[in-house]
């Protein structure tokens, strides 16, 4: 029987045992976190192809008393300029227009298919969990070329309010932590479900590019987008229904195809410099912003603030060094 002082130190054995215990705990935590993140309830939203559809009933105008009541109810939670903007884009006083202010998806699901050719929700998307589910549900309820109006508080407004609320230096520290919590965690595979289970999707931070990109991904065409107060309002037209709408998660890296010698296609990695869902905005950006020299857009809303700096300094290209290994 050996003694601790002969060949082994009791402290070495204790250290090894603790290291193995810590590794086992980390492994079990990672294993269960991975299973939790898979979220078995999050299944892709599939839809069969549908025949061309028109609104079910001919439109009629509301009675004057109903028009006044609708105006008063809308002005209780929004400004008159918002009401005028909505009036400009849809006939809000038509029996074929449905208006609501709700974060509950049930209020959309219960609507008869193709009963309304315009749906307006005054509840900011920042307060709604399952934005893609909302968009696809609206898509299913609208007839062909139906109009969908929604609103959200853009990330730029959230940033401005935080920087104004706190003193210098502290405001930037708070904003960086806030950004990591509200923008980074919801987009990562391992933390996305945990984030939404804790916050229930309330007070989300959404960029303009992400909201417009989600709409295009879910089969809408952007007709107009205006800032009214602290909220951005988007008017979109239903164009098609994607066969499958899946949850999309984004990491810090993006994998791209490149063509090399003799036409050989290979993969390269870069740091992500664009907002989520930006890949669905190519046509929208092309239609609204002209190209500058070099084939880039004059005002590309898809690129993040950090991404502009990374592109300017070529930092986003650093992961391509892996191709040399």
Give the label of every model feature segment:
Residues 106-118:
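A short acidic, Gly/Pro-enriched loop at the edge of an enzyme's catalytic core
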């Amino acid at each position: 029987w050996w003694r601790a002082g002969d060949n082994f130190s009791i402290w070495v054995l204790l250290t090894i045992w603790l290291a193995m215990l810590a590794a086992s705990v980390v492994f079990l935590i990672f294993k269960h976190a991975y299973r939790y993140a898979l979220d078995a309830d999050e299944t892709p939203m599939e839809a069969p192809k549908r025949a061309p559809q028109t609104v079910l009933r001919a439109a009629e105008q509301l009675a004057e008393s109903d028009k006044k009541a609708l105006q008063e109810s809308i002005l209780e939670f929004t400004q008159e300029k918002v009401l005028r903007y909505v009036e400009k884009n849809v006939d809000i006083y038509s029996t074929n227009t449905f208006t609501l202010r709700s974060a509950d998806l049930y209020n959309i699901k219960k609507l008869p298919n193709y009963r309304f050719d315009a749906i307006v929700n005054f509840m900011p998307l920042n307060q709604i969990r399952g934005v893609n589910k909302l968009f696809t549900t609206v898509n299913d309820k609208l007839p062909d070329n139906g109009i969908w109006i929604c609103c959200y508080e853009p990330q730029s407004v959230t940033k401005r309010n935080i920087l104004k609320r706190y003193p210098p230096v502290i405001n930037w520290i708070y904003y960086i932590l806030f950004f990591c919590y509200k923008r980074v965690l919801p987009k990562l595979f391992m933390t996305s479900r945990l984030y939404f289970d804790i916050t229930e999707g309330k007070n989300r931070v959404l960029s303009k590019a992400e909201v417009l990109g989600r709409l295009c991904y879910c089969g809408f065409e952007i007709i107009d987008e205006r800032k009214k107060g602290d909220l951005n309002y988007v008017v979109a037209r239903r164009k098609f229904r994607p066969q499958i709408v899946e949850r999309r998660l984004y990491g810090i890296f993006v994998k791209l195809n490149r063509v090399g010698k003799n036409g050989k296609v290979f993969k390269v990695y870069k740091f992500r410099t664009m907002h989520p869902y930006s890949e669905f905005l190519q046509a929208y950006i092309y239609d609204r912003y002209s190209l500058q020299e070099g084939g880039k857009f004059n005002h590309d809303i898809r690129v993040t603030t950090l991404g502009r700096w990374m592109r300017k300094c070529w930092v986003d290209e650093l992961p391509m060094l892996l191709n040399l290994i």
